[in-house]
């Protein structure tokens, strides 16, 4: 249901925000709130010069109904003084 969608999208937003503010590296986090959970991974990070590429996957679940939703994003981050995040592709699945 909607709770799983919100959880997955919230996890993806957390990952994008962490790319803007913190180091661009592989990381994993579980976020729980109000009966929803998002398992978020930033993976396959590669760096060439001032550019990083990688993948975000966020698996959202409604802990009561067990409904699940998956969001996958490929991204590029350029850091030439001001960090820019570009989303290359987005996929969402149940």
Task: Name what the model sees in each region.
Residues 1-94:
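Conserved functional hotspots that engage anionic ligands or polymers and/or phospholipid headgroups
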């Amino acid at each position: 249901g909607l709770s799983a969608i919100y959880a997955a999208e919230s996890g993806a937003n957390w990952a994008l925000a962490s790319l803007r503010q913190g180091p661009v590296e592989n990381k994993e986090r579980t976020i729980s709130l109000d009966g929803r959970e998002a398992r978020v991974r930033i993976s396959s990070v590669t760096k060439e010069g001032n550019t990083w590429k990688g993948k975000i996957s966020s698996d959202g679940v409604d802990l009561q109904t067990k409904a699940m939703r998956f969001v996958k994003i490929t991204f590029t981050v350029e850091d030439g003084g001001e960090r820019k995040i570009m989303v290359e592709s987005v996929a969402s699945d149940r």
